[in-house]
C-alpha cells in the first residue's frame, strides 16, 4: 500500500499534509507479540508511525496486569490490552481511556476454542458439569465465554473448576488427563490440531463479532498530549483498515515478531480487524464479564473512551 494513500485517508482526522510537517513525538508503548495485540507492530513495520511523525517505542509484556500497571505507574504512555483487563481497570478507577481499536474476534474465523482430548467423551455443555477447565487468565474473557456457553446450552457453569495455565501447557495437560478442557488460542490451536479436538467455539457465546483488545492511554498523558494522541489513534485506525485487507502482509510481520512457522500462519484462524471504535463490538465483553461478577459493576462501553474518541 502506498504510504501517501495511507496518509490521506485517515478517518476522522486530516492527516495529510499536516502530518508531514507535524513536530515529531516519542510515545512509550506496551503490547504483546500476539496477533490480536499486533496492530502497533504492523504500523511500525509498515512505516506508518514514522510517516506520521511518531516514534513509537514498543515494549513487549506477557500479561495484561503488568502492562496496565506500567501504564498506571507512568512508565508507559499507551498500551494495547484486552477488553476484560481494561474494563477491570476502569471499574477500579485506574486513570486510563480507550483511544483506538485493537484486534477483534469473528465467528467466521474462530481464534479461540474450547478444546478437549481426542479420546474425550465430552459432547455437550451439560457433560462439562463438574469438570476442570484451564484458561490463560482467571476471571477474564476466556472464562466468561466458557461459563456463558455452558449456561446457555443446558449446563451449570457454577459447577466448573477453572484453573490458570499458560497456553503452551494446555494441550499436554489435556492429553495427560490433568484437565478436562481448555480455552486454546492461536497459534497453539493450529500447532495442536492433531492432539486435541474442538468441543465448541466458546467465544461465539459472547457475540459473533467483538473486540478482544483495544488501545488505551494514560489520562494524564492524554491531557498533556491531545494532538499526539489523535495522530496515534488515526494511524491505528488506518492500520486496522490496512490489516483487514492484507492478511498475507500481516502474516509476514506476525512471523517476524513471533517466530510462528509460515506454514502454521497460513493455516491459522486469523484476528479480525475493525477500524472503528464501535461500542457494539465492546459492550458484549463488558456485559459477560460483569454478569459473572468479574467486574465491580456493568457500564456502558462509551465510558471507557477518551472524550475525543467518542462519536
Language-model regions, residue ranges each:
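Secondary-structure end/capping motifs
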Residues: 223-294
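Short helix-loop capping/hinge motifs at secondary-structure junctions, enriched
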Residues: 119-126, 156, 220-229
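Conserved C-terminal helix/tail region of periplasmic/extracytoplasmic solute-binding proteins
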Residues: 290-311
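N-terminal export signals
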Residues: 4-22
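Short, solvent-exposed loop/beta-turn-alpha elements that line the ligand-binding surface or hinge
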Residues: 105-107, 204-207, 274-281, 301
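Short, glycine-/small- and polar/acidic-enriched structural segments
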Residues: 22-153, 164, 180, 186, ...
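Pocket-lining segment of extracytoplasmic ligand-binding domains
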Residues: 84-85, 163, 168-253
Amino acid at each position: 500500500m502506498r504510504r501517501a494513500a495511507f496518509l490521506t485517508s485517515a478517518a476522522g482526522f486530516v492527516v495529510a499534509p499536516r502530518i508531514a510537517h507535524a513536530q515529531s513525538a516519542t510515545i512509550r508503548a506496551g503490547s504483546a507479540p500476539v496477533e490480536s495485540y499486533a496492530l502497533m507492530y504492523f504500523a511500525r513495520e509498515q512505516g506508518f508511525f514514522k510517516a506520521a511523525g511518531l516514534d513509537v517505542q514498543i515494549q513487549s509484556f506477557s500479561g495484561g496486569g503488568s502492562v496496565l500497571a506500567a501504564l498506571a505507574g507512568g512508565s508507559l504512555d499507551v498500551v494495547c490490552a484486552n477488553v476484560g483487563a481494561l474494563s477491570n481497570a476502569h471499574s477500579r478507577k485506574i486513570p486510563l481511556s480507550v483511544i483506538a481499536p485493537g484486534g477483534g474476534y469473528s465467528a467466521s474465523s474462530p481464534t479461540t476454542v474450547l478444546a478437549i482430548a481426542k479420546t474425550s467423551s465430552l459432547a455437550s455443555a451439560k457433560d462439562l458439569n463438574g469438570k476442570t477447565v484451564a484458561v490463560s487468565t482467571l476471571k477474564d474473557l476466556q472464562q466468561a465465554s466458557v461459563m456463558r456457553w455452558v449456561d446457555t446450552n443446558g449446563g451449570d457453569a457454577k459447577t466448573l473448576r477453572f484453573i490458570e495455565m499458560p497456553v503452551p501447557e494446555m494441550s499436554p495437560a489435556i492429553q495427560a488427563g490433568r484437565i478436562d478442557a481448555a480455552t486454546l488460542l492461536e497459534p497453539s490451536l493450529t500447532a495442536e490440531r492433531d492432539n486435541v479436538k474442538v468441543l465448541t467455539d466458546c467465544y461465539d457465546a459472547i457475540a459473533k463479532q467483538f473486540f478482544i483488545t483495544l488501545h488505551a492511554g494514560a489520562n494524564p498523558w492524554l491531557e498533556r498530549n491531545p494532538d499526539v494522541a489523535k495522530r496515534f489513534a488515526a494511524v491505528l485506525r488506518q492500520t486496522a483498515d490496512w490489516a483487514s485487507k492484507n492478511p498475507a502482509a500481516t502474516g509476514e510481520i506476525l512471523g517476524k515478531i513471533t517466530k510462528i512457522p509460515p506454514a502454521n500462519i497460513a493455516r491459522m484462524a486469523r484476528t479480525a480487524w475493525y477500524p472503528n471504535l464501535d461500542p457494539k463490538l465492546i459492550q458484549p465483553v463488558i456485559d459477560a464479564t460483569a454478569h459473572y461478577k468479574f467486574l465491580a459493576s456493568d457500564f456502558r462501553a462509551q465510558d471507557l473512551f477518551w472524550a475525543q474518541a467518542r462519536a
